[in-house]
Amino acid sequence: MNYRLSIYFIISILFQNCTQVTTESADNDIDQSGPPIDTIDSSTTISGITVNGFIDTSSYLNSGFTFLNPTQINKNREAIGGDSYTEVYGFNIPEENRARGIRWNGDDETTNLWKPQGITGFVRDGVRYLLVTWYANNSSDYKGSRITLIDISPSSNTYLKYRHILLTQPTIPTSVSNYTQYNTFAPLDIHAGGVAYFNHKLYIASTNLGIRVFDLNKIIEMKTGDTTANLCGKSDNGDLYAFNYRYILPQTGYYDINGGANPFSSIQINAEGTELWTAQYYAGSADASIVPKIYGFPIASTGMILNEDIKLIIPKNSLFSDYHAHGMQGLFRKGSKTWLSCTGSPSNSYGSNARLARYTDGEPDTVRYRWPYGAEALYYESEYDYLWSLTEHEPNSGYSNGSTVNRCIFAVKFANYE
């Protein structure tokens, strides 16, 4: 970079830090004066990353359990429909780009005991479902992680009804202090930062391990009525408990991925249905010296993740002084383009420092759009051409903004971001 361009780059960065973006078009402007600083800026097949064979952990499920699928789940909570989702703090999507959205019920949109993270969806017996992952927080952290199954079909008799389902795994902790742990299954303590759906299975990002797998046809009903909500596992008399959750979704296996592709902060299947893509979350401040990357792992029609033709992309983002895409919370891949849900930008736009960033392989920068405060993962619903996301924070989490509503799930018209 010559002296004149260096001065221009410094001035532009200072301007971004001191000025609030006030229009969508301004936020989409690309400063391409800075050169690419990595040699890998397009989809590149790499070596060194190893997907170990699928580790089947499902033997603990051969104990006389009765399995259910999503259509058989009793949904006991109701989301808020209409335009109420636009009332959350920092919701800055232009009206012409909005498709639809929902808000959680009062308990779920304000709790600090659980944090929503990943999102995906599927159709079963003509009914559209969204599925959201959460991790347990604060005094509930020992409960691990859960998913939420939401009916979003307007013609369905359970429209906007939803149910929380606890995630479990077979490794029994050696000692616990917060609850009574029985045999057979235990909570799954992961961040659950992203989730992808493929052929009735869920693939959930596991930060340092790789990818955990769950079969949606193997939901198990629990014994409820435990007023303490502090029992988990199969008791000596055969009763099943999960902190008073009515259902669990047990892990059936996992993929241990080695070679430095971690942290596995988010995950999503590409539009072509041939690859699972994961992104690394690194903040632009505390982790400024680390280069965030995204990886593509081929998936067979059987649902097996393959240890071949693994791809690497290092997306650019000129909002950060090092031109790297920090703060990646979610991603979606279509063709040679990747859409990134990013937080922690050094500039603010209508109450939010999040951006939806579109990166095309080989380009020196992303195209950026306004994106709501606290935005997390991405999911593409191809039948309707919707790009879904969700926001994480409960009211006044992180910022004392006076808002009583922060959390929502929303969809935008994907064509407006292509």
Residue map of PLM features:
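Bacterial Sec-dependent N-terminal signal peptides
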Residues: 13-43
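Short loop/turn segments immediately following beta-strands, especially the blade-tip
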Residues: 150-157, 214-238, 291-309, 414-418
